[in-house]
Amino acid sequence: MVKTETKHSDAEQLVRTKLDELIEFRSQTDDIKEFWGKQFDLGLAWVQYPEGAGGLGINPKYQLLVTEKLREEGISQQNRVANILGIGMGAPTIIEYGTPEQISKYLRPMFTTDEIWCQMFSEPGSGSDLASLSTKAVDDGDGYIVNGQKVWTTLGHLAKWGLLVTRTDPDVPKHRGLTFFIVDMESDGVEVRPLRQITGEAEFNEVYFTDVKIPKENILGSLGEGWRVSLTILMNERVAIGGNVRERGSGAPGPVSYTHLTLPTILLV
């Protein structure tokens, strides 16, 4: 019991010390993205993640100390809303399945909202049956060539990166022939078509892939592991969306609307 309490005390003190440094940094910048970058570098983005990946390698319960302190200081935490598909769903999935290089490359600009993320699951002909998807990725030696279509892609027109599930092996049971990729949404052959709502807004999109080349280092997880990665992302989605619910009648914008209202300019408040 004493040992456990000591560990708790040490972890709490570590977070509070880091928070003091972060709050002090606030007086040095009016750029909220720079502030979020400092938060990441101090390990206060996700305290449970490894050091160097926005975390401190400690129990996630200590993240509450960070959240409460930033709220107390009146500092915006809306990056978690503006880039909810990245921070809420992409980050934990990349931590679980990504390579060290992927973790190093993607997480920091994701947290600062310099790079917005989307996910691409649904297809016009597959309905709710994810395993029946038909978007194909064919090995051409040093990468994969992707052809197909996705639909209902939230924030696809704003995203720099997308999480894409494809079929890489048509000759095995459908759940086993899937592979996940991290795709650059600015790649040649990627076409994003906004789906206009009656309000005139376009939160959702169709995304077309025509001979899109994706390097092999952009595979997330292992070849053929796409079904497992998909289930992880969907689990993370429930947690992320549930944690950002707005009270009905509050007048506060939801996660997607907030992104439209604030990007590309977000101010420190």
What are these regions (language model features)?
Residues N147-R193:
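A short core secondary-structure module
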Residues V212-V229, L234:
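Long, acidic (Asp/Glu-rich), low-complexity accessory segments flanking structured domains
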Residues T113-F121:
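A short, Trp-centered hydrophobic/proline-enriched beta-strand micro-motif
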Residues M1-I84, I95, E101-K105, P109-T112, ...:
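Amphipathic, small/basic residue-rich leader segments at the start of a protein or domain
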Residues M235-E237, I241-Y258:
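A conserved active-site cap/scaffold subdomain adjacent to cofactor or substrate pockets
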Residues T259-T265:
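Conserved small/polar residues in nucleotide/adenosyl-binding loops
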Residues T135-V138:
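A structural signal for short hydrophobic beta-strand segments in well-ordered beta-sheet cores
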Residues E186-K213:
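Flexible, small-/acidic-enriched active-site or ligand-binding loops
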